[in-house]
Amino acid sequence: MFIEEFEIESITSTHLLEVLTREYPEVRSPSIKGAMRWWFRALAGSYFGDDAQKLKEIENQVFGSTKERSRVKISVTPLSSPKRLNLKEFKDKNVGYIWFSINLLGKRGTITHYYPPGSRFRVVLESPSERVIKLATLSLWALVSLGSVGFRSRRGTGSMKIVRASSEVLEDLGLTTEFNSIDEFKDSLKRVLDVTGEILGVKNSETNKSLPSYATLKFSDVEVFGPGKNTWEVLAQFNNSYKEYLRRRIKKYQRIIFGLPRFKLRGVRKDLRRASPLWFGVVEIGGKPYGRIIKFFQSTFHPEVRSKHIVDWNVLSNFDWFISSRLPVTKVWGGWSG
């Protein structure tokens, strides 16, 4: 049995929706496993073009499905207790635009607790297969280093870092849990994608040049900006830039590219859902907080929204130009050539 143990610390506050059967919400194994599956697809999908069926087969071999058991056991133990939500604490932090729904649901009582920055969690991965434990470890690394956890996780909440790892796998794979420079962060992105291909036994072939219908790291842009004086400054800088871009730099109908629902958009049903292809979080580089922006480009935005007039991926990519005019932005990955 291969066992890998990690201690993870929150960089930004982590918010979870209430579960009726619990006194307060917790970061639990199913939520971490679900997030790891997403990032596995983003890594492995970079090698399969638009072959969603093949990607699903590989994913099920690691995480299981309704027809086959998962080959990796994921255990999550909170080492910190959640704190009761006090909306006044966030009132002067200048994050009202990107965290508007936290304020809304907090007032309704749908969100009552959260994990403040500095909260810690233990994550243990177990598998009888060395190949599976490596792929699961890569997925967890990507989740922590590139993604986030919880409600509004694509807008700055739930950013994490690995503070301790009892893991021979990470060392064997040549991945670090601390980034001493932007170049080291950049090299790590290339490394995690290369190693994924090596373990899967596939290459980034010539047939994998067109945009797939699902999100992959290959067809994404990754930028960082900063450093900020503190995490709240980084969050506020993105909040202000994002708000300015959506409200004053693009037309209302063009906002659709940043996710659904959009309740005041003609011709688009209000009940349609589509998670934003733009992920914003905070990453520590050289011990300082940096904003991290990832934009995932796909061939299909939503099966019921096909109009190129409404869905314009250039609106998403042009956000780079806008935020670069306001903040010191460094591109660390550029897989999108559209």
Swiss-Prot record:
Segments passing through the bilayer: none
InterPro entries given in the database record: Cmr1-like_C, CRISPR-assoc_prot_TM1795, RAMP_III_fam
GO cellular component annotations of the record: cytoplasm
Disulphide bond pairs: none
Keyword Signal: no
Any one biological process term the GO annotation gives: defense response to virus
Keywords: Antiviral defense, Cytoplasm, RNA-binding
Superkingdom classification of source: Archaea
GO-annotated molecular function: RNA binding
Localisation per UniProt entry: Cytoplasm
Pfam families for the chain: Cmr1_like_C, RAMPs
Database matches in NCBIfam families: cas_TM1795_cmr1
Annotated function: CRISPR (clustered regularly interspaced short palindromic repeat), is an adaptive immune system that provides protection against mobile genetic elements (viruses, transposable elements and conjugative plasmids). CRISPR clusters contain sequences complementary to antecedent mobile elements and target invading nucleic acids. CRISPR clusters are transcribed and processed into CRISPR RNA (crRNA), formerly called psiRNA (prokaryotic silencing) in this organism.
Stated family: Belongs to the CRISPR system Cmr1 family.
Assembly and interaction partners: Part of the type III-B Cmr ribonucleoprotein (RNP) complex, an elongated RNP with Cmr2 and Cmr3 as the base, with Cmr4 and Cmr5 forming a helical core along the mature crRNA (39 or 45 nt in length), while the complex is capped by Cmr6 and Cmr1. The 5' end of the crRNA is bound to Cmr2 and Cmr3, while Cmr6 and a Cmr1 subunit (Cmr1-1 or Cmr1-2) cap the 3' end of the crRNA.
Record-given protein name: CRISPR system Cmr subunit Cmr1-1
Source organism per UniProt: Pyrococcus furiosus (strain ATCC 43587 / DSM 3638 / JCM 8422 / Vc1)
